[in-house]
Structures are given as structure tokens and as C-alpha cells.
């Protein structure tokens, strides 16, 4: 046990302005307490939402900003009231690091929907210090917002599961879509989409990948194990697939029409939005009404669901398809990610990188 009373500094890579360019930044870690873990970051995934934040696409960014919310690390020290973790444990943490602990979502293991949640970066913690993310040597996180990484899952493979993995696992469970035999669609084959294929297939679903071009067909069918592939501009193919899917994960992070995909859903089908888009999406209401279809959304998952998802992935042998990079490559990686030039998630080897 440690008191965690002394102030610590660390070095991360931060954006200073909406250009989004990251460079070394040394800063003080937030005040720590008896429920906190002091963690050495081992690996951190690179998510498309990191781009939205560092470039102020949502109009709420504060600088300097150290991004990164798919974090796996090693516990260096624990507070006096920590009961679940010990020094040396390998743990993961995600985009939410605080909540009010008293609202309905918090009391029902859905703390990610707390209106007073604290983001792991680009936010302010309860002690007034800015939160900073996982593109850094060390972090401090409360015990409630940490999960143990199962043995057998490599750190760099586990990191994307903290966001991309649970983003698809949670709605499948919450919306009653976990049973085998369902027919699902994955719109967009990126970091979240490729995990959607893997997790849905592991649940026994028939999976159709829907993409804007034919270039990912072989990857989707032969490498990820999808059952079918649709090109959204193929009018005949889209027409043949009308009323064929129980659900579609819409992972696309840019404005796009919804009508072509609503048409693919069966009666009571669900279009589940998971891509962050800072502009209105449009559809005509009869496409929803006449099939009792739902357009809904889902945001990551609870810590309980994250634990379940990690065990599920371990049991099924599921891992992320990744490209491991050093921190000095992260700006190039962000540029490539904007162009969808990655299969399928960049992961920063933080512990193996020179940070200053």
C-alpha cells in the first residue's frame, strides 16, 4: 500500500491547439487518494474520437490535451482503500474515470451515462486538475474505473478492447441481441467495425459487412470471417438485402444518409449508432414507422460490461487486428487514421517509446 500523497509529474504527448499535432509535454498528475491506482502505461490504442478531440471538432477542446483512452498498464502503487488490485497487476481503463455515484445510471452499473461523468482527458477532475489521457508514461485512476486484464491477452491486443470491443459488446447485450442465429450488419470496417464482426461471429450471428467500396471484401470475408459483403452503391445488391438484418452497427464517423441502411432492417430491426458525428443525420419517418424499426445509439459500456467483454474475448480467442507503433510515429498514425489507412487499430507501445 502507498499513501499516494506526493505530487508526481509525467511526460505525455499533447496537442496544443486545433492543428492536432502532438508533441512532448511534461505535467503534474492530478491529486490522488485512498481509492486511486498509480499506473505505468504499457499500451494505448488510437481511436478516431481522439482526432475529434485534438482538432476541436466538437467545439469543446481545452489545451494542452494528452489524448488516448484505450489504456493498458501496470499498477505501480495502490491507495489505502483499494481492495481489488495489487502492485504488479495488469489493468485497463477507458474514457470515463469519474461519476456522481448517486444517479440512476450510476446505481444500475451504467455509469458511462451519468450526466456528471468525468472524461479521462479534456475534462477536469474533482480536485480541479485537468484530466489527461493514456499517451503518457503514467496515469492516476480510481479503482472503480479500472478492470483487470485477463492472463493470455497481450497488452497491445487488449488496449483497443477498452473502447472498440466494449462499444459493440454492450449494445448486443443491452438490446437483447446476444443469442445465436441473428443476422447482423456492420457498416464501416474500421477499429470498431472489425471488432463488431469478430464479436458478433463469436456469438453465432450471420454477419454482413457494408462498405462504400469493394476494396475490403477479401479482408472482411477471408480474414475477419464475415458471411456476406455489401457495397452501398450497388443498387441491386442493396435491394436484394432488403428486410434481411436484425440489427446494423453504424460505425461511420462522418455524415451519411440513413435511409439505405434502414431499408436493410427486418421488422423491429435496430440501427445502432456508434460513430461520433457533429452534424444532423436525416431520414424520412415512414422508413422507421412502417417497419417498427429503431434508430438508437450506444456509448462504450459499463465497467461491469467491460470485464464481461474481456472474459468473453479471452474465452473465444478474440483479439484486435492492430499495427503497433512508437510514440514518435503518432502524428503520422493520426493522419493515416483520418484517411482510413490502418488495419484496423493503431496501438502505441508507450512503455517502449521515448516520450521526452
Swiss-Prot record:
Involved in lignin biosynthesis. Catalyzes the final step specific for the production of lignin monomers. Catalyzes the NADPH-dependent reduction of coniferaldehyde, 5-hydroxyconiferaldehyde, sinapaldehyde, 4-coumaraldehyde and caffeyl aldehyde to their respective alcohols. Keywords: Lignin biosynthesis, Metal-binding, NADP, Oxidoreductase, Zinc. This is Probable cinnamyl alcohol dehydrogenase 2. Pathway: Aromatic compound metabolism; phenylpropanoid biosynthesis. It is an enzyme of class 1 (oxidoreductase). It comes from Eucalyptus gunnii (Cider gum). Belongs to the zinc-containing alcohol dehydrogenase family. Zn(2+) 1 binds at residues 47, 69-70, 163. The gene is CAD2.
Amino acid at each position: 500500500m502507498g499513501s499516494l500523497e506526493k505530487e508526481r509529474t509525467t511526460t505525455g504527448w499533447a496537442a496544443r491547439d486545433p492543428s492536432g499535432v502532438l508533441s512532448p509535454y511534461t505535467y503534474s498528475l492530478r491529486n490522488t487518494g485512498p481509492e486511486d491506482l498509480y499506473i505505468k502505461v504499457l499500451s494505448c490504442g488510437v481511436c478516431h474520437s481522439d482526432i475529434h478531440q485534438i482538432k476541436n471538432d466538437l467545439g469543446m477542446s481545452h489545451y494542452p490535451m494528452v489524448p488516448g483512452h484505450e489504456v493498458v498498464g501496470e499498477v505501480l502503487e495502490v491507495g489505502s482503500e483499494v481492495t481489488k488490485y495489487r502492485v504488479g497487476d495488469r489493468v485497463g481503463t477507458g474514457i470515463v474515470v469519474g461519476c456522481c455515484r448517486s444517479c440512476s445510471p450510476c446505481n444500475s452499473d451504467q455509469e458511462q451515462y451519468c450526466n456528471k461523468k468525468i472524461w479521462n482527458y479534456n475534462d477536469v477532475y474533482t480536485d480541479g486538475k485537468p484530466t489527461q489521457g493514456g499517451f503518457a508514461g503514467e496515469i492516476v485512476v480510481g479503482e472503480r474505473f479500472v478492470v483487470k486484464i485477463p492472463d493470455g491477452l497481450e497488452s497491445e491486443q487488449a488496449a483497443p478492447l477498452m473502447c472498440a470491443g466494449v462499444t459493440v459488446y454492450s449494445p448486443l447485450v443491452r438490446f437483447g441481441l446476444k443469442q445465436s442465429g441473428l443476422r447482423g450488419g456492420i457498416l464501416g470496417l474500421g477499429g470498431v467495425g472489425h471488432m463488431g464482426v469478430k464479436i458478433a461471429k463469436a456469438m453465432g450471428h450471420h454477419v454482413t459487412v457494408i462498405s462504400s467500396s469493394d476494396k475490403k471484401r477479401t479482408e472482411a470475408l477471408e480474414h475477419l470471417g464475415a458471411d456476406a459483403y455489401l457495397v452501398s452503391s450497388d443498387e441491386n445488391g442493396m435491394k436484394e438485402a432488403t428486410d434481411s438484418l436484425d440489427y446494423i452497427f453504424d460505425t461511420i464517423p462522418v455524415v451519411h444518409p440513413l435511409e439505405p441502411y434502414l431499408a436493410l432492417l427486418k421488422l423491429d430491426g435496430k440501427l445502432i449508432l456508434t460513430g461520433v458525428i457533429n452534424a444532423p443525420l436525416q431520414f424520412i419517418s415512414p422508413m422507421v414507422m412502417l417497419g417498427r424499426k429503431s434508430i438508437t445509439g450506444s456509448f462504450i459500456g459499463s465497467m461491469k460490461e467491460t470485464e464481461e467483454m474481456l472474459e468473453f474475448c479471452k474465452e473465444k480467442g478474440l483479439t484486435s487486428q492492430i499495427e503497433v507503433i512508437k510514440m514518435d510515429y503518432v502524428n503520422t498514425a493520426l493522419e493515416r487514421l483520418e484517411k482510413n489507412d490502418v488495419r484496423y487499430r493503431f496501438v502505441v507501445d508507450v512503455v517502449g517509446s521515448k516520450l521526452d
